[in-house]
Amino acid sequence: MSDFAFFALEALIKCIIIIAIFASLAGLATYAERKVLAYFQRRIGPDMVGPFGLIQLVADMIKLFTKEDIIPSNSQKFIFAIAPLISAICAFVSLAAIPMLPEFTLFGKVIQPIVADINVALLFVIGTSGLCFYAVFLGGLASNNKWSILGAARGLVAIISYESVGALALIAIVMLVGSFSLVDINNYQSDGFFSWLIFKQPLAFVLFIIALFIETNRTPLCLTENDAEIVAGYGTEYSGLRWGMFFIGEYASMIAGAILVTLLFLGGFNSFWIIPGWIMMIVKSSFIFFWYFWARAAFPQLRPDQVMKMCYLILIPLAVLNLLITALAVLL
């Protein structure tokens, strides 16, 4: 087998594995979120379907597959139909340039757990994950429903604003490391616990986490949905499998975001003491992923004006200040 054929086959297998694993993890995350929220609210959560309620995932999947798929008669039908697909595709494509685990040897071949190790991986991931919002905007606009349009418009304003915050935070990381490659950023933090970038860029870490909550539409910074104001927002008219595609795309983006935070700030998949790197990667990513649930349970929903004022009056000035300080530190 030629090197190109082996590379193509390896990339195809990796793509299939990533889609299968992360689609399954997205479903498992819904169960985890229910259990965590139930614990915070002194409830039991899912416990009737299967042991510890684990088969609830299968029940939900059957419901989504068998529920009637309704397309409103006054909607832009083609755009309405493909918007959920855009959400899921963009979320999974963004995973292609993210190194998941340390490299390992299989049948004499060195395998890198990454589909494409490109030298601008950080730009690729941020760009493709940002495209997920086109699905939200197009779905809300095509629904021809006032609640959907309001949710899409609110989300559009927020994502444009907070993408700037996240980008400015990441530029500081790139200035320190000198590379857009996520593998290089991971290797930069390989000298031990105190080489983690969270200690060198604590403000960038906080800014990026806040921007991540906006990009993944998570409480308390979610503007696209609000039961008391705009019902289900962009997803008001969606049902069945199409709604499920939005759901899978959102949770896949959350998982990708948690892995990205681990790679950028928490030492990535470097080993820690006697703990292997792959275990560290899973533990740290799971901890960041837990923050999504904790924030939803602990904090109230912010008003749109509060979210936007926080962005332009506090976060962007802080991001610019952090960038200037980092530039001075690099020059000196």
UniProtKB/Swiss-Prot annotation:
Q: Which GO terms describe its molecular function?
A: NADH dehydrogenase activity; oxidoreductase activity, acting on NAD(P)H, quinone or similar compound as acceptor; quinone binding
- EC assignment: the record states 7.1.1.-
Short name of any one Pfam family annotated for the protein: NADHdh
- Write down the top EC class of this protein: translocase
Q: List, in alphabetical order, the GO biological process terms annotated in this UniProt record.
A: aerobic respiration
**Origin, by domain of life?**
Bacteria
Quaternary structure annotation from Swiss-Prot or TrEMBL: NDH-1 is composed of 14 different subunits. Subunits NuoA, H, J, K, L, M, N constitute the membrane sector of the complex.
- Per its UniProt record, what NCBIfam families does this chain match? PRK06076.1-2
Q: What is this protein called?
A: NADH-quinone oxidoreductase subunit H
Question: What gene does this protein come from?
Answer: nuoH
